[in-house]
């Protein structure tokens, strides 16, 4: 799952676009 906030959100490997966008919802 994506981190919704905090220093790590931009490097969360499960996310894209920084925060709040799950990898499987990337375009």
Curated annotation (Swiss-Prot):
Keywords (A to Z) from UniProt: Amidation, Disulfide bond, Knottin, Secreted, Toxin
Residues modified as Tyrosine amide: 27
GO CC annotations, alphabetized: extracellular region
Principal localisation: secreted
GO MF terms, alphabetically ordered: toxin activity
Location within or outside the cell: Secreted
Keyword Disulfide bond assigned: yes
Cysteines engaged in disulfide bonds, as pairs: 2-16, 9-19, 15-26
Role this protein plays: 1 uM of this toxin does not show any effect on voltage-gated sodium and potassium channels. Does not show antibacterial activity on both Gram-negative and Gram-positive bacteria.
Note: Negative results: does not show effect on Nav1.1, Nav1.2, Nav1.3, Nav1.4, Nav1.5, Nav1.6, Nav1.7. Does not show effect on Kv1.1, Kv1.3, Kv1.4, Kv1.5, Kv1.6 and Kv3.1.
Domain notes: The presence of a 'disulfide through disulfide knot' structurally defines this protein as a knottin.
Protein name listed in UniProt: Conotoxin Lo6/7b
């Amino acid at each position: 799952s994506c981190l919704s906030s905090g220093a790590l959100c931009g490097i969360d490997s499960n996310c894209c676009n920084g925060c709040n966008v799950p990898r499987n919802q990337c375009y």
